[in-house]
Amino acid sequence: VPETWDXXDYGAQT
């Protein structure tokens, strides 16, 4: 999981 993972709106990992 990326460090900027909140729920699915961050990076590009849906």
Swiss-Prot record:
Main enzyme class:
hydrolase
User: Which UniProt keywords are present, listed alphabetically?
Assistant: Disulfide bond, Hydrolase, Protease, Thiol protease
UniProt EC number: 3.4.22.-
Highest taxon listed in the record's lineage:
Eukaryota
Instruction: Decide whether keyword Protease is in the record.
Output: yes
Give me any GO biological process, just one. Answer: proteolysis
Supply one GO molecular-function term.
cysteine-type peptidase activity
Q: Does the keyword Hydrolase apply?
A: yes
Family from the record: Belongs to the peptidase C1 family.
Can you state the subunit structure given in the record?
Dimer of two small subunits linked by disulfide bonds.
The protein in question is named: Karatasin
Q: What is the organism of origin for this protein?
A: Bromelia plumieri
